[in-house]
């Protein structure tokens, strides 16, 4: 069973880059602040350009550094996409449950993500701002159906009251770890037999100070 805990004293076994995408004002920066620092600011301003935060945690006795990247959703910042997506092994695709338009744009964001990132990147669809449930404009079932159709994980969250924020990030990070661990095992087995592993192709992941190539596999799930 996986264990999650902050640990800054051990060596880093893996560094996983995860990107936050979605329209502006859906709460991407607030989700990042809640997960990385357990903070929430009512006065949050729109993100300009790109920033990232890190959090170190433990999964199955391995020390993982999650590098979470955040960029503004406005069209004028789209120029950063190539560098932004490069090397990402996970993505949090965020919409605001009170703004139907932000959900309607999810398909476009997903297309852009899949056009720039590894085709097997692990993706979590997030319906944020459940604390504003009385203003809901996107039925949960609509998002579940989209996630199932596109082979995505799905959760609804609230950065304000922290509901499901931790589980959503940990689900993605655990899935990435599971895939990487499985591929490393296959690589070791084929290495011993003199074979080549076709699995070890795709997104670069830093492993214990060295770069090894791996790719994630999306998985369907709902919450």
Swiss-Prot record:
* UniProt-listed SMART domains: ARF (SM00177), RAB (SM00175), RAN (SM00176), RAS (SM00173), RHO (SM00174)
Q: Which PROSITE patterns match?
A: RAB (PS51419)
Pfam families, sorted: Ras (PF00071)
Query: What Gene3D superfamilies does the annotation carry?
Result: P-loop containing nucleotide triphosphate hydrolases (3.40.50.300)
Kindly state the positions of the motif Effector region in this protein.
44-52
Instruction: Name any one GO molecular function.
Output: GTPase activity
Instruction: Write out the entry's keywords from A to Z.
Output: Cell membrane, GTP-binding, Lipoprotein, Membrane, Nucleotide-binding, Prenylation, Protein transport, Transport
Q: Which SUPFAM superfamilies match?
A: P-loop containing nucleoside triphosphate hydrolases (SSF52540)
Q: How does it sit in the membrane?
A: Lipid-anchor
* Chief localisation class: membrane
Positions bound to GTP? 22-29, 70-74, 128-131, 158-159
Give compartment(s): Cell membrane
Question: Where are the membrane-spanning stretches?
Answer: none
Task: Tell me the domain of life.
Answer: Eukaryota
UniProt cross-references to InterPro entries, sorted A to Z: P-loop_NTPase, Rab_GTPases_membrane_traffic, Small_GTP-bd, Small_GTPase
Q: Does the keyword Lipoprotein apply?
A: yes
Lipid-carrying residues in chain (S-geranylgeranyl cysteine): 219-220
Does the UniProt entry include the keyword GTP-binding? yes
Q: Which GO terms describe its biological process?
A: protein transport
Q: Name one GO cellular component term.
A: plastid
- Purpose of the protein: Intracellular vesicle trafficking and protein transport.
Family as reported in the entry's similarity comment: Belongs to the small GTPase superfamily. Rab family.
In its UniProt entry, what is this protein called? Ras-related protein RABA4c
Species lineage: Eukaryota, Viridiplantae, Streptophyta, Embryophyta, Tracheophyta
């Amino acid at each position: 069973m996986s264990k999650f805990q902050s640990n800054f004293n051990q060596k880093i076994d893996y560094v996983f880059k995860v990107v936050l995408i979605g329209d502006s004002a859906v709460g991407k920066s607030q989700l990042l602040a809640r997960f990385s620092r357990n903070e929430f600011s009512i006065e949050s301003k729109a993100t300009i350009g790109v920033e990232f935060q890190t959090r170190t945690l433990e999964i199955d006795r391995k020390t993982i550094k999650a590098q979470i990247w955040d960029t503004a959703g406005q069209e004028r910042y789209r120029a950063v996409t190539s560098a932004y997506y490069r090397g990402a092994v996970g993505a949090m695709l965020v919409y605001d449950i009170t703004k139907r338009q932000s959900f309607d744009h999810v398909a476009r964001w997903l297309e852009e993500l899949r056009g720039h990132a590894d085709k097997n990147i692990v993706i979590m669809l997030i319906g944020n701002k459940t604390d504003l449930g009385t203003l809901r404009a996107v039925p949960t079932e609509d998002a579940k159906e989209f996630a199932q159709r596109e082979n995505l994980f799905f959760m609804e969250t609230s950065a304000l009251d922290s509901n499901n924020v931790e589980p959503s990030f940990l689900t993605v990070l655990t899935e990435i770890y599971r895939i990487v661990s499985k591929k490393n095992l296959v690589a070791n087995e084929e290495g011993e037999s003199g074979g080549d592993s076709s699995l070890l192709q795709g997104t670069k992941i830093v492993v214990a100070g060295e770069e090894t190539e791996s790719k994630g596999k999306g998985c369907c799930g709902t919450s």
